[in-house]
């Protein structure tokens, strides 16, 4: 799988997980409709399915996915919650993405 497809799949996976957790949060903490649990559960099902599409060892996928997840949550904080990321949020996200790139794309012996 190409690097661009891998990162895109990680981003889509992260969005599914974030939405799957955020929708029940809205119900529990902000008094929104209980019906949000249905798309929340579907999002978590999609998250698990998307995570299974990555073509490398599960442990490596989970470790690398964490870097993309961090960056996607910071983006969610800004776009959905309306909270502008700090310089340190952005630096931390960049470091996490660098870690993801090293884990996923470093040369490996066959």
Curated annotation (Swiss-Prot):
Membrane topology summary: Multi-pass membrane protein
Transmembrane regions: 7-27, 33-53, 63-83, 87-107
Keywords for the protein's UniProt record, in alphabetical order: Cell inner membrane, Cell membrane, Membrane, Transmembrane, Transmembrane helix
First and last residue of the signal peptide: none
InterPro entries: UPF0060 (IPR003844)
A Gene Ontology cellular-component term: plasma membrane
Location within or outside the cell: Cell inner membrane
Protein name as it appears in the record: UPF0060 membrane protein Pcryo_1498
Organism whose genome encodes this protein: Psychrobacter cryohalolentis (strain ATCC BAA-1226 / DSM 17306 / VKM B-2378 / K5)
């Amino acid at each position: 799988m190409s690097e661009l497809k891998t990162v895109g799949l990680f981003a889509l996976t992260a969005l599914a997980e974030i939405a799957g957790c955020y929708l029940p949060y809205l119900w529990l903490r902000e008094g929104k409709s209980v019906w949000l649990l249905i798309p929340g559960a579907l999002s978590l099902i999609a998250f698990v399915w998307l995570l299974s599409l990555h073509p490398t060892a599960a442990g490596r996928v989970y470790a690398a996915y964490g870097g993309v997840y961090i960056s996607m949550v910071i983006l969610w904080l800004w776009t959905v919650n309306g909270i502008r990321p700090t310089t340190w949020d952005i630096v931390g996200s960049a470091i996490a993405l660098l870690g993801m790139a090293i884990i996923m794309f470093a040369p490996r012996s066959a």
